[in-house]
């Protein structure tokens, strides 16, 4: 069992100030702030272990030593890069605040991690997942969540944070507040619109306590991230899918299927809410009207049924 090392205020106070800055001024999500806190407190504990109790005493050789120790402990390259990124951003902030003269992490490199193509479901598997037995309102709610997640390519947090006034059923659009509090509009697709209409007709039966689109049928409160993950996993098993079903996989499937059909990487980037095109390029083997046109022509569940 590893020993818990107390972090002195000479290290922790600066971390607390930085966390307040990224939460209030940069408006980063609670999950991101928590990740920063975890990484920086781990680094601070490692510094205490080598007798460094002030950030001003940290030098480049110490940064390399901390990274090497993290690597030896079994930290994978991607996780190591995340830890180093948190440290570098934190030290950059200290420089901007006049707390440090230079950033000791500048010029230090971490092992490169290869980017792997995210796993996704094929169109037949998506259809199998969606074809659920609608015996009760709970099933209707879950079917609607699945359709919206796949139809709009949302992040899990974006799905759970949706409010009624974010949905425009007439236009078939959803307003999403993504990473860094950046707002974007995304087409929903015909199937998602139809199922939202079904769910909205039932939602009021559960005395919703707030404006959340997706609520618990027991409490009427907004569904948590973990609750959605459990429901998606449950339906994957019930529908006999061989691979594990999770919200992220549906988002990846949305991106892959749309890119395969349209070849429009830039449009997919905008729909996913990626700040950098390089993030979207992992799926490779504008204005809103243009995005909607690409979506309507390419997405499997946006196409009109033939009469």
Swiss-Prot record:
Pfam families: Phage_int_SAM_1, Phage_integrase. The active site is at 155, 179, 248, 251, 274, 283 (o-(3'-phospho-dna)-tyrosine intermediate). It is found in: Cytoplasm. SUPFAM superfamilies: DNA breaking-rejoining enzymes, lambda integrase-like, N-terminal domain. GO terms for biological process: cell division; chromosome segregation; DNA transposition. Its main location: cytoplasm. It comes from the Bacteria. GO terms for molecular function: DNA binding; tyrosine-based site-specific recombinase activity. InterPro entries: CB, DNA_brk_join_enz, Integrase-like_cat_sf, Integrase_catalytic, Integrase_recombinase_N, Integrase_SAM-like_N, Recomb_XerC, Tyrosine_recombinase_XerC/XerD. Residues 116-296 form the Tyr recombinase domain. GO terms for cellular component: cytoplasm. Residues 9-95 form the Core-binding (CB) domain. FtsK may regulate the catalytic switch between XerC and XerD in the heterotetrameric complex during the two steps of the recombination process. Keywords: Cell cycle, Cell division, Chromosome partition, Cytoplasm, DNA integration, DNA recombination, DNA-binding. Forms a cyclic heterotetrameric complex composed of two molecules of XerC and two molecules of XerD, in which XerC interacts with XerD via its C-terminal region, XerD interacts with XerC via its C-terminal region and so on. Belongs to the 'phage' integrase family. XerC subfamily. HAMAP family: Recomb_XerC_XerD. Site-specific tyrosine recombinase, which acts by catalyzing the cutting and rejoining of the recombining DNA molecules. Binds cooperatively to specific DNA consensus sequences that are separated from XerD binding sites by a short central region, forming the heterotetrameric XerC-XerD complex that recombines DNA substrates. The complex is essential to convert dimers of the bacterial chromosome into monomers to permit their segregation at cell division. It also contributes to the segregational stability of plasmids. In the complex XerC specifically exchanges the top DNA strands. This is Tyrosine recombinase XerC. It comes from Proteus mirabilis. The lineage of its organism: Bacteria, Pseudomonadati, Pseudomonadota, Gammaproteobacteria, Enterobacterales. The gene is xerC.
